[in-house]
């Protein structure tokens, strides 16, 4: 039994509903829509087969209902995530499923896991006994930028796909936030905890423990900036070491802040298209993290 036959067996309404989906009577269509909505994601799998229908009304309305179901799912998912802790990875992939509803999060988790395993094996092969965080970061840079060939998308900086984590991993390119996010997700899997830093018009990450403190500009091929180098830079603006830890835009960004900014980037893209419907939806989803 194929997938469609299985769905029809579980929901015998589907075939009768699809026959009525193009009805000119708006009342009938609204009832058909409500019925499909009640079946949730099962309806999405069914309706997708009608996107290319020869009947334009069937195709248009199938897509309309499909999009409503997907948005309702994302709305609940992101609202629930906003109350949890350590949600950044899942939230980023959930945002991507707004544009790519068929996205398989488990598959991308496995890709990130595999990258981390490969990198960890390389580190262990080179440093059998002891390895510093700085040495790990240098190997991570080599793996990320030269083996996996991730790079900043300077050619089409404002492309929407730069903000969708699945596409960043698929294409090996993205914007400062998305590239930094993939980088720190791999780093976290090998025991290095980075924090995001929301600096104006850019995004970098920071590592800090009792011994080390440094910044990494992932978008610019993982340039490592020591605290000493950062201090020297800020001295020209009259900011000295005693004030360094209180510089507002060098504070660790909370996960909500990072998610909010991912949405802000996407909203900017779709406002410029323009795509009012997407902007409205993204602003609603963004509001859970404001």
Question: Which residues does each PLM region occupy?
Answer:
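A structural boundary/capping signal
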Residues: 1-290
């Amino acid at each position: 039994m194929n997938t469609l036959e299985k769905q029809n067996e579980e929901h015998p309404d589907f075939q009768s509903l699809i026959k009525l989906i193009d009805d000119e009577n708006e009342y009938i269509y609204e009832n058909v829509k409500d019925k499909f909505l009640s079946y949730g994601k099962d309806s999405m799998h069914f309706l997708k087969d009608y996107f290319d229908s020869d009947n334009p009304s069937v195709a248009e309305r199938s897509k309309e209902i499909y999009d409503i179901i997907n948005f309702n799912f994302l709305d609940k998912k992101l609202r629930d995530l906003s109350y949890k802790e350590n949600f950044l990875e899942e939230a980023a992939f959930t945002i991507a499923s707004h544009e790519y509803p068929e996205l398989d999060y488990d598959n991308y988790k496995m890709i990130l896991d595999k990258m981390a395993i490969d990198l960890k094996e390389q580190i262990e092969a080179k440093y059998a006994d002891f390895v510093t965080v700085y040495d790990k970061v240098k190997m991570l840079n080599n793996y990320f930028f030269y083996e996996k060939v991730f790079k900043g998308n300077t050619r089409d900086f404002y492309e929407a796909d730069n903000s969708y984590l699945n596409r960043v991993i698929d294409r090996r390119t993205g914007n400062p936030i998305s590239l930094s996010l993939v980088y720190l997700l791999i780093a976290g899997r090998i025991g290095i905890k980075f924090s995001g830093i929301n600096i104006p018009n850019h995004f970098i990450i920071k590592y800090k423990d009792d011994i080390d403190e440094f910044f990494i500009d992932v978008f610019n091929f993982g340039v490592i900036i020591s605290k000493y180098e950062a201090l020297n830079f800020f001295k020209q603006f009259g900011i000295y070491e005693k004030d360094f830890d209180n510089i507002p835009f060098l504070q660790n960004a909370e996960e909500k802040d990072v998610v909010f900014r991912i949405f802000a980037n996407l909203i900017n893209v779709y406002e410029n298209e323009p795509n009012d419907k997407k902007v409205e939806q993204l602003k609603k989803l963004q509001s859970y993290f404001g």
